[in-house]
Amino acid sequence: MAEMAELCELYEESNELQMDVLPGEGYMEVGRGARGPAPEEGPMEEEAGPAAARAQRGLFPEAGADLEGDEFDDWEDDYEFPEEERWSGAMHRVSAALEEANKVFLRTARAGDALDGGFQARCEKSPFDQLAFIEELFSLMVVNRLTEELGCDEIIDRELMLTREEETT
């Protein structure tokens, strides 16, 4: 029971950090913040403007017009991503809990298979006469139906009562 509670808690944590694709859009948005413009909608000209101006002023002479790759590579290497660490920690706990649940399931399945195998082995050793079983079943069904139709239950009950009274006296 505690394992299920832990799984539910971890599932809720992982949902908070999940990435969602906006319907009708081709790019992904992280988190729950307000949606910004898609790449085709917007500020590419604004971003390209200062970068191109810096290239023209000589700040990045070797980059020229294609500054995007070199400009952003350096800060990504130095920046620590706490969301990613928190997400990987939650995912690690979820995967550990799932592995434990899988082990429990496998143990249960093996025990069920062993029990089923033992039952089948006992059935093979015990003699079962199908013909005798069918005869007994048929006779019980016929006798029950006849006693219901003819009201023989009352007759049988009376006879049993009479025999018991005779035995007691």
UniProtKB/Swiss-Prot annotation:
The keyword Nucleus applies. Residues 54-120 are annotated as: Interaction with NR0B2. It is found in: Nucleus; Cytoplasm. GO terms for molecular function: histone acetyltransferase binding; transcription corepressor activity. The keyword Nucleus applies. Its main location: nucleus. GO terms for cellular component: cytoplasmic ribonucleoprotein granule; nucleoplasm; nucleus. Keywords: Cell cycle, Cytoplasm, Differentiation, Nucleus, Repressor, Transcription, Transcription regulation. Interacts with RB1 and EP300 and acts as a repressor of MYOD1 transactivation. Inhibits EP300 and CBP histone acetyltransferase activity. May be involved in coupling cell cycle exit to the transcriptional activation of genes required for cellular differentiation. May act as a candidate coinhibitory factor for NR0B2 that can be directly linked to transcription inhibitory mechanisms. This is EP300-interacting inhibitor of differentiation 1. A motif (LXCXE motif) lies at residues 150-154. Residues 31-50 are annotated as: Disordered. InterPro entries: EID. The gene is Eid1. Interacts via its LXCXE motif with the entire pocket region of RB1. Interacts with EP300, NR0B2 and TRIM27. Inhibition of MYOD1 may be partly due to the ability of EID1 to bind and inhibit EP300 histone acetyltransferase activity. One of its GO terms (biological process) is negative regulation of transcription by RNA polymerase II. It comes from the Eukaryota. It comes from Mus musculus (Mouse).
